[in-house]
């Protein structure tokens, strides 16, 4: 395994056939599906397939976002070794994107521990008001995360449960592609 696969300098190009995987998840949930990598201490979106609804979430490929307040960011933090996650989170208060953003580094650390334990991350309107995101990280590879996001009214707990199962399968398939 090359050194760049365990650093926070992941390549900015998606693995082959990732669009097919993302399309399957967008079709399953009706919501936008994303792939993000850890790049220079931020989550960088490298692929997205939009959901089928007129009102949907959209992120531009190449956009970099904070780790502490996004589903993909939390999944990325949970996918790297704990010491690296701690270094990325730091000790200073973190920037709030919404009133729901967790800004206390100790609480972010607790959220990452929960993410590791349950196997998925949630963004409950922490980056954008009214948007929920569920994401699964790919530990043991270049730090990557797959996610589904959409308006909170449609991203019900039942949809999130179904998405977690599907995203976990996608993460396993991506790990195989990268092996």
Residue spans for each PLM region:
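Beta-strand scaffold of nucleotide-dependent catalytic cores
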Residues: 45-48, 57-59, 147
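A short acidic/small-residue loop/turn micro-motif
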Residues: 51-53, 150-151
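Short, solvent-exposed recognition segments
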Residues: 53-127
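HTH-adjacent hinge/linker in prokaryotic transcriptional regulators
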Residues: 1-40
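Extended hydrophobic
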Residues: 104-166, 170
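Conserved hydrophobic/aromatic positions in well-ordered beta-strands
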Residues: 36, 44, 134-136
């Amino acid at each position: 395994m090359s050194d760049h696969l365990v650093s926070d300098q992941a390549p900015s190009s998606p693995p082959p056939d990732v669009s097919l995987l993302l399309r399957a998840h967008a079709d399953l949930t009706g919501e936008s599906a994303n792939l993000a990598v850890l790049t220079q201490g931020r989550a960088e979106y490298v692929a997205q397939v939009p959901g089928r609804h007129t009102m949907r979430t959209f992120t531009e490929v190449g956009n970099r976002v904070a780790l502490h307040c996004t589903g993909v960011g939390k999944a990325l933090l949970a996918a790297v070794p704990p010491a690296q996650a701690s270094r990325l989170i730091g000790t200073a208060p973190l920037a709030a994107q919404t009133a729901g953003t967790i800004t206390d580094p100790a609480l972010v650390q607790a959220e990452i521990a929960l993410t590791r334990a349950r196997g998925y991350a949630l963004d409950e309107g922490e980056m954008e008001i009214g948007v929920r995101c569920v994401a699964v990280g790919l530990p043991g590879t270049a730090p990557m995360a797959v996610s589904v996001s959409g308006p909170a009214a449609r991203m019900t707990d039942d949809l999130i449960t179904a998405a977690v199962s599907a995203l976990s399968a996608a993460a396993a398939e991506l790990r195989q592609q990268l092996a």
